[in-house]
Amino acid sequence: MLYPDLLTKKFKLNPHQLQQFDLYYRFLNQENKKYNLTALISLSDVYCKHFYDSLILKEILDFNQIQNVCDVGSGAGFPSFPLKIIYPNLKITIVESSLKKINFLKQLTVVLGLKNICFVHQRAEKHTLSYDCVLVRALGRLDLILKWCRLLIKKNGYFVAMKGKKYAEELKDSQHIIKKIKMNLIKINKQELPNQLGTRINLLFQTH
């Protein structure tokens, strides 16, 4: 099965969305060296380890019920840009410490024809606004990112930490901070990427 077809079958993409993912892949390949975005640049890696990996978040959270999302340390736009493609009404804020990556993402926004995306050149712990949902992918240790991001999440809001197979140790080491900052772990979602390309663990927390 071709990788675009894999996305279409799994996530019920329409032709316009499929075209947006194709543009995303091509633009990422074109600009990657200039902006030093990702080492995973092959067709299989981009579609499976970036696009697919981002979209499986829709299986743990109904983004139709979410108004605004903050993606911390988005890098090349993952996971928020793939989610924005299939949920065009989402309001996205990117908090990114690399100005170079923000410049790439601003261009990508135009290429994909996306709207309602804001960019903040700042570290997460310095940002002061709050959101319905905060997303973090491969940014650092769980206890640290929980502390950095807690104030960004509204009351009864959600926090998603995208982790790998070693999540259990990080989760164990984070119990004290989870209790201290008044968050509950409400879901652990394990997913296998296509073609045995890896295991993803997505942790869903809610504030109280």
From Swiss-Prot:
GO terms for cellular component: cytosol. Its EC number is 2.1.1.-. It comes from the Bacteria. S-adenosyl-L-methionine binds at residues 73, 78, 96-98, 124-125, 137. Its main location: cytoplasm. Keywords: Cytoplasm, Methyltransferase, rRNA processing, S-adenosyl-L-methionine, Transferase. HAMAP family: 16SrRNA_methyltr_G. The keyword Transferase applies. It is found in: Cytoplasm. CDD domains: AdoMet_MTases. This is Ribosomal RNA small subunit methyltransferase G. InterPro entries: rRNA_ssu_MeTfrase_G, SAM-dependent_MTases_sf. Belongs to the methyltransferase superfamily. RNA methyltransferase RsmG family. Specifically methylates the N7 position of a guanine in 16S rRNA. GO terms for molecular function: rRNA (guanine-N7-)-methyltransferase activity. The lineage of its organism: Bacteria, Bacillati, Mycoplasmatota, Mollicutes, Acholeplasmatales.
